[in-house]
């Protein structure tokens, strides 16, 4: 039963990883994209999860793997078509996440008008931190996120810069996809995305709350 599954281990049993693109204006500009009137959504499979202690696996078909730092919102209970005013009642907690992206593959997908599945949804493309209970974050729009590669600061941003707020995103997504307990929504990345290669070490954190470390590896197959 769902009640026997700890939300703190959401990556072991959560079904849906819903990702929001283009939710920070500075990142939209660096990608030479346009700010849209509605969120851009895409999905990752549950096999994309990589909890801390496991590696980030670099697909053999990319030569340009990028990090994208994101706040993840973990759903605490099922919701469908929830109004924006009630959306936060369904949040169980948060996690820091990476949306690892095969940028060269994504660029080709964009040119051909194809979905981003090959670029975004590969195994271990969603590294996650330890779970942060909702009670420890009174306002998720007042967080500072940071990411370093081999000790060099690459990304730094504040969740107050989101284009679409978390309640809006939850409401919007829930009108399309029924969200279940343990599902997670990645809320977009600030500017500073960039490449990583085999043996690079990524460290990232939410200032004052949680941090995580990962190493980039190539799969054995």
Swiss-Prot record:
Work out whether the entry's keyword set contains RNA-binding.
no
Give the subcellular location. Answer: Mitochondrion; Cytoplasm, Cytosol
Provide the binding site for Mg(2+): 68, 70, 99
Any one GO CC term of the record: mitochondrion
Its needed co-factors are: Mg(2+); Mn(2+)
Taken from the record, one Pfam family name reads: FAA_hydrolase
List, alphabetically, the Gene3D superfamilies matched: Fumarylacetoacetase-like, C-terminal domain (3.90.850.10)
Q: Which reaction does it catalyse?
A: oxaloacetate = enol-oxaloacetate; oxaloacetate + H(+) = pyruvate + CO2; a 3-acylpyruvate + H2O = a carboxylate + pyruvate + H(+); acetylpyruvate + H2O = acetate + pyruvate + H(+)
Assembly, in brief, is: Homodimer.
What is the recorded name of this protein? Oxaloacetate tautomerase FAHD1, mitochondrial
Recorded name of the encoding gene:
FAHD1
